[in-house]
Amino acid sequence: MAKKVVAIIKLALPAGKANPAPPVGPALGQHGVNIMAFCKDYNAKTADQAGMIIPVEISVFEDRSFTFVLKTPPASVLIRKAAGVERGSNEPNKKFVATITRDQLREIAQTKMPDLNANDIEAAMNIVAGTARNMGVKISD
């Protein structure tokens, strides 16, 4: 019989830099999970994506064991990286901070595709374009 899940914890952590300090320690500690084991596993799996924020979904079972699933980086992080800006506009649609091409948009959409609720790449591109627009990033043809 399958183990019973007692909690699902969602965190967004820097790749390869998880440590027992907050937010990881308190989130996992209250469920009795071995924090160091999670940190070592997470850091090993994300070592090749240094500098990115990687969301993780941790399933905690009643025997205090756990499994985790890595998600794709947030669209905003990928857009900022492609545009080469530190942060989005504080007045989106009035002040534009950068421009990205349709090719860059397609690349970001392909990266995000497993986590998006979209059936094809065009729908995924529209979702990512909306995020870019809300950040004050223009899309050029």
UniProtKB/Swiss-Prot annotation:
CDD domains per UniProt: Ribosomal_L11
UniProt PTM comment: One or more lysine residues are methylated.
Pfam family, one: Ribosomal_L11
Membrane-crossing residue ranges in chain numbering: none
GO terms of molecular function: large ribosomal subunit rRNA binding; structural constituent of ribosome
Listed PROSITE patterns: RIBOSOMAL_L11 (PS00359)
Domain of life assignment: Bacteria
GO BP: translation
Alphabetized InterPro entries for the sequence: Ribosomal_uL11, Ribosomal_uL11_bac-typ, Ribosomal_uL11_C, Ribosomal_uL11_C_sf, Ribosomal_uL11_CS, Ribosomal_uL11_N, Ribosomal_uL11_N_sf
Keywords attached to this entry: Methylation, Ribonucleoprotein, Ribosomal protein, RNA-binding, rRNA-binding
Homology family: Belongs to the universal ribosomal protein uL11 family.
Stored PANTHER family: 60S RIBOSOMAL PROTEIN L12, LARGE RIBOSOMAL SUBUNIT PROTEIN UL11M
Function: Forms part of the ribosomal stalk which helps the ribosome interact with GTP-bound translation factors.
Subunit structure as annotated in this protein's UniProt entry: Part of the ribosomal stalk of the 50S ribosomal subunit. Interacts with L10 and the large rRNA to form the base of the stalk. L10 forms an elongated spine to which L12 dimers bind in a sequential fashion forming a multimeric L10(L12)X complex.
Protein name: Large ribosomal subunit protein uL11
The species this protein was found in: Microcystis aeruginosa (strain NIES-843 / IAM M-2473)
Organismal lineage: Bacteria, Bacillati, Cyanobacteriota, Cyanophyceae, Oscillatoriophycideae
